[in-house]
């Protein structure tokens, strides 16, 4: 009879186990891979940083430009245009003035022109001053912003110092008014009450 009872219990347990569905979760790293496929942006900051770097690598670099610096302030724009005109018409030009000198930037459709301008005018004397001519690679705006944000974040982390150091527990302060209340609320002993009652009756 005990054997039959055990068989009944075993069968009922097997039936309940077969009807019960067990949910098995996949590994977290595999589940996270479904986010981009479903159109959800990755929540991990490292993933966003990798995506941004990947996009920047895919973007083609900007065309190189020529920079002419240390130009005397009394040199006119027309003089600079005449100097560049012999190499063709630039597709981009900009002139910057500061307190000491001028700087102009040019971009040409033919990159080989840049080398010729450097050979022709680097160290060229203009109004008793030697100008400097160089070829440089301009950066995209978001690249400069990322570099600025990284420097800013580093400065903030250095300013914070040790993590958690700015969370300081302030000591509990009790005002003088509360101290007075605490003294008044102190329970009086039975002997003191009897003494006060005797003094009141005698008086």
Curated annotation (Swiss-Prot):
The keyword DNA-binding applies. This is RNA annealing protein YRA2. The lineage of its organism: Eukaryota, Fungi, Dikarya, Ascomycota, Saccharomycotina. Associates with mRNPs. Interacts with YRA1. Residues 64-138 form the RRM domain. It comes from Saccharomyces cerevisiae (strain Lalvin EC1118 / Prise de mousse). CDD domains: RRM_YRA2. The keyword DNA-binding applies. The modification N-acetylmethionine is found at residue 1. Involved in export of poly(A) mRNAs from the nucleus. Recruited to the coding sequences as well as poly-A sites of active genes. Residues 139-153, 163-180 have a biased composition (Basic residues). One of its GO terms (cellular component) is nucleus. It is found in: Nucleus. GO terms for molecular function: DNA binding; RNA binding. SMART domains: RRM (SM00360). Residues 1-60, 137-203 are annotated as: Disordered. Residues 11-20 have a biased composition (Polar residues).
């Amino acid at each position: 009879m005990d054997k039959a009872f055990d068989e009944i219990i075993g069968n009922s347990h097997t039936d309940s186990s077969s009807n019960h569905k067990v949910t098995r979760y996949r590994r977290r790293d595999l589940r996270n891979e479904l986010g981009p496929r479903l159109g959800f942006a990755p929540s991990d900051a490292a993933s966003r940083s990798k995506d941004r770097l990947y996009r920047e690598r895919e973007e083609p670099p900007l065309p190189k430009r020529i920079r002419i610096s240390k130009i005397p302030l009394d040199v006119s724009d027309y003089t600079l245009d005449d100097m560049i005109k012999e190499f063709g018409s630039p597709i981009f030009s900009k002139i910057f003035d500061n307190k000491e000198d001028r700087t102009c930037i040019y971009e040409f459709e033919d990159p080989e022109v840049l080398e010729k301008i450097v050979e022709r005018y680097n160290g060229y004397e203009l109004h008793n001053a030697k100008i400097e001519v160089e070829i440089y690679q301009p950066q995209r705006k978001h690249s400069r912003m990322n570099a600025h944000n990284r420097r800013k974040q580093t400065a903030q982390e250095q300013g914070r110092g040790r993590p958690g150091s700015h969370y300081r527990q302030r000591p509990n302060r009790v005002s003088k008014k509360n101290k007075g209340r605490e003294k008044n609320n102190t329970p009086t002993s039975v002997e003191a009450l009897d003494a006060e009652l005797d003094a009141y009756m005698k008086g």
